[in-house]
A protein has these predicted regions:
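Rossmann-like adenosine-cofactor binding region
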Residues: 96-191
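Residues at the starts of beta-strands that form the adenosine-phosphate
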Residues: 66, 88-89
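Short, polar loop motifs at secondary-structure junctions
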Residues: 2-8, 92-99
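Glycine-rich NAD(P)-binding loop of Rossmann-like domains
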Residues: 47-78, 105
């Protein structure tokens, strides 16, 4: 099944079917996509591609950037490897504080807000649980840097969508690149589609 989560199948779970998990199968391609989204957003590539005339310089480098990754599973491990040539300072937020190769700092989820402060780019790469629904809302977005991008390759429910729209419309953060949304699929009339600092790709 080409999507994450079993919520849609809960009504038909029974002992007549064998359910298996493809955990880790998509870690590397998802991490690659996350990196592509970060570069596209931070370097203002999407904006340049839509421009009919050139203006002043825009965008920032990923080289040497402060990176925060929320989640400590296979996608994070693959993403950390992909970030190695960029010499980023990497902080990982996860449930259990255990060292990860290539990561400068690992903190618990209770330190999420501190890990958002000063980050140039924030990646969401964690599973959706009752504790992580609405993990990123207005209080978290307000502490982020005005140039920071948030990249969500996890689940749409991690971000409070209305709060994200507010943050993007008011330039509270630099932008958002979303491989997942809440709701999903996103209605054609949703404001996220038309925001110049929002990139959306099909999960």
């Amino acid at each position: 099944v080409p999507f994450a989560g079993i919520e849609n199948f809960v009504p038909i779970l029974d002992d007549d079917r064998t359910w298996t998990c493809g955990k880790g199968v998509y870690a590397e391609p998802v991490a690659e996509h996350a990196l592509a989204l970060a570069l596209t957003g931070m370097r203002h590539i999407a904006g340049y591609s839509r421009a009919s005339k050139w203006t002043g310089p825009a965008g920032r480098n990923l080289l040497g950037a402060a990176v925060t990754i929320v989640g400590g599973g296979g996608i994070t491990e693959s993403l950390v490897r992909l970030l190695t040539p960029f010499h980023c300072s990497i902080t990982v937020v996860r449930r259990t504080v255990e060292n990860i190769d290539g990561v400068d700092t690992v903190v618990g989820q209770e330190n999420l807000v501190d890990a958002l402060v000063g980050a140039d780019v924030v990646f969401l790469a964690l599973s959706l649980t009752p504790e992580t629904v609405g993990l990123i809302g207005k209080p978290e977005l307000e502490v982020m840097e005005p140039h920071a991008w948030i990249i969500n390759v996890a689940r749409g429910g991690h971000i409070v969508t209305d709060d994200l729209v507010w943050a993007l419309e008011n330039n509270v953060i630099g932008g958002a690149a979303l491989d997942v949304t809440d709701p999903e699929p996103l209605p054609e009339s949703h404001p996220l589609w038309s925001l110049p600092n929002c990139i959306i790709t099909p999960h």
